[in-house]
Amino acid sequence: MVKLDRRLEQIKKMFVDRKKYFVINRGRQYGKTTTLRELKKYLLEEYIVVSLDFQELGSAEFVDESTFARAFADIFVRTLERNTASSMKEMSESLTKLRGNDDDGLKELFVRLSHLCADSPRPIVLMIDEVDSASNNQVFIEFLALLRKYYLNRDETPIFHSVILAGVYDIKNLKLKLRPESEHQYNSPWNIAAKFKIDMSFSTDQIAEMLEEYESDYHTGMDIDGMAEEIYQYTSGYPVLVSSICKYMDEDLPEENGFEQSSKVWSKKGIKRAVKMLLSENIPLFDSMVKQLDLYREMREMMEQILYQGRKISFSPAEKSINLGLMFGFLKEENGHVAVANRIFEMYLMDLFIAEESIRSDMYLCGQVVRNQYIEGGRLNMKLVFEKFVQHFTEIYGSSTEKFIETNGRRFFLLYLKPIINGTGNYYIEAQTRDARRTDVIVDYLGEQFIIELKIWHGNEYNERGEKQLAEYLDYYHMNKGYLLSFNFNQKKEIGVKEIFIGNKTIVEAVV
């Protein structure tokens, strides 16, 4: 398990000790619940911590004020009794009164909570996990409004020392979710919340530290730093993705052919295999992603433009689709532009988009029909893939407009390639080089890598520069052969496939 000591220390010093009320809102399975659980242990010496989970409350508990107040008081008292037995004597009378009468509302509940906080021998920290469970209920918004009121008056009226809410939605978007009319979208009932900016992703150092502990127990002989960096390259530190890859490697890979030895499992090849296993599973995180993409079509269209067209979209968290993508953990800011949060998300989304489009795609069908001829002795003949793609693309789309090809050309190639490598290989788009004119695709097939540059052709000078860039990129990957697919709109273009030599590099170039 990745150590959270540094994160817990930061939260305590920057927020809890300073009496802050705040929200930890991150994407699904981003370590929120784990952080709250560990933070509770970390705070117990100085504070009384009441940690609640709103998933314990059903929708019936939010039907009205009285029902919610009674349910909240009940879960609060049970949690306090279970976890703070040593403090119970001094607080017993306040606890007894907290449940109140059946017809008491939120105002009466907060009066009793104030008395409880006044009687407490130590400051009380309130944590509420899964606040999204309450997000469609007006009574919860009113609960937040009273928290805000007591927070502002706490110099005169005792109340919680610190309040921590955790969920996917931030408070502003809880309001948006409840009342989507434009005039109400941004009226937060809880604008006293401190901004929570602590990075909850795992760094390469944290991943390495976890692998080091594993290595001390199992002696696999792995390259710890190299493995940590490779895992980070796929996940960007998204907690559940890091832990899932490691779990597949620990539990599932040793049962597969070629991975009988632990040194084979804990290798870059093992990571690639674990990633492939992860992408083939319907994990809750992926299910949630599909659901949100269906709900927010503009966000989905933006992701398609980024991945398929290499479109550069300026980063602005005020833009609704970008804000939602950040909140769900699907997007991030990168050099002033919007980017998909990590490589695994990119691979999953590409698989999803292509699977949906493959049903009606002529290019996918062409790749599927002739897929077997591209495999020779267990190796993928990428030059032949290029030759056949040029043939099929010219037959189907040769007379299409420049705008149509510029927008869709790269998507057609990826649709063509997918059935050829499906089940055996995989590919991802290199974010470092993705732009409106140039995109690099890296294909993995049975341990062999192919670097493919997809490029919109804009004259000889630009083309020669693209060839040089690809040669430099091959140096980075320590490879001598690369592939260049140019979508050329010059009427005098020479359609076909040829080989170009730059220094000791061979570039197979296809022009369509």
Named regions from a protein language model:
Residues 413, 441-443, 447-458, 473:
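Conserved catalytic cores of phosphodiester-cleaving nucleases, focusing on short active-site segments
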Residues 49-50, 62-89:
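Conserved NTP-binding/hydrolysis module of P-loop NTPases
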Residues 99-170, 177-184, 464-471:
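Conserved Walker B catalytic segment
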Residues 416-447:
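Active-site metal-binding core of divalent-cation-utilizing nuclease and nuclease-like domains
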Residues 463-467, 474-502:
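Nucleic-acid nuclease catalytic cores
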Residues 203-328, 334-335, 363-375:
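Winged-helix-like regulatory helical subdomains adjacent to P-loop NTPase cores
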Residues 23, 44-63:
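Conserved catalytic segments around the Walker B and adjacent sensor/switch elements
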